[in-house]
Design a protein with these regions (language model features):
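Core catalytic alpha/beta fold that binds nucleotide/phospho-ligands
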Residues: 2-257
Length: 257
């Protein structure tokens, strides 16, 4: 597993514009850090499905069985494996720790005083964010050029920003804003009670904030190496530590204590 650090002061639009620092072992449970673990669906063979089903909790197993497509079923199961992996690695949370939900359906550890986590998956990436504080993460596969749609869920300010963007293709710029909006909603944990067009997130800046705790939050967004996916995270942290986990690491078991 390799790890990278993004510093808040150098966060930019695209992956090749970001300044990354390759690091070795770093201090976990740091109050100033947000941890991101991601794993590619491409690293899991379809034959791994029975093993993942066997290891899943009854609730997660039932949820996975509702999917028709194998890839969707795999994403559902891998996400829960990645959650357990990340919480144990980052905060030494026991693998069997109970997961509950708040009144709006946001998953939380049953121990509400423990670390917070959030999951997202789309396309080939499954992503987990962990933090001592509320956190939200979203990943989206970038639409094909010419297919990026700016819907009514974007604010007036965001539509104008996309109309005049000159720093990135429209499909990437749209995905940047959309994933920030989704990450912010997941950070708040208020479900669909907040309208998407009631706030704007442009260049890591929250405008017209929706109801909720917003002091000191940071937004981080980046593309993967081939610009096919965008990931955004919202939370309280001066740095984001990104780890890429292989499918084999999850299949081989959770990290040691």
């Amino acid at each position: 597993m390799t790890s990278l650090v993004i510093h808040a002061e150098v966060t930019c639009h695209l992956l090749h514009e970001l300044v990354y620092l390759l690091i070795g072992p770093h201090k976990r449970e740091d109050q100033k850090l947000i941890y991101i673990s991601r794993v590619s669906l491409d690293t899991f063979p379809k034959s791994a499905l029975p093993q993942l089903m066997e290891r899943a909790s009854p609730e997660r197993r039932d949820r996975a069985r509702r999917y028709v497509r194998i890839d969707d079923c795999l994403r559902c199961l891998i996400a829960d494996e990645l959650r357990a992996y990340s919480l144990k690695l980052d905060y030494k949370v026991p693998v069997q720790s109970e997961v509950s939900k708040n009144a709006f359906g946001k998953p939380l550890l049953a121990n509400r005083d423990g670390p917070k986590f959030n999951l997202s998956h789309d396309g080939k990436w499954i992503v987990c964010a962990t933090s001592p504080h509320p956190v939200g993460v979203d990943v989206e596969a970038v639409a094909e050029p010419g297919l990026a749609v700016v819907s009514n869920d974007f604010s007036v300010e965001e539509v104008e920003a996309l109309r005049t963007t000159a720093t990135a293709p429209l499909s990437i710029a749209r995905a940047m804003i959309w994933t920030r909006k989704e990450a912010y909603l997941k950070y708040l944990g208020l479900g669909l009670t907040v309208q998407l067009d009631s706030f704007s997130v442009i260049d890591q800046t929250l405008l017209s904030p929706a109801e909720g705790m917003t002091d000191g939050i940071q937004f981080y967004s980046w593309c993967d190496a081939d610009n096919s996916h965008v990931i955004s995270v919202c939370g309280h942290g001066e740095e984001v530590v990104i780890s890429c986990v292989s499918g084999q690491e999850l299949l081989d078991g959770l990290p040691p204590s």
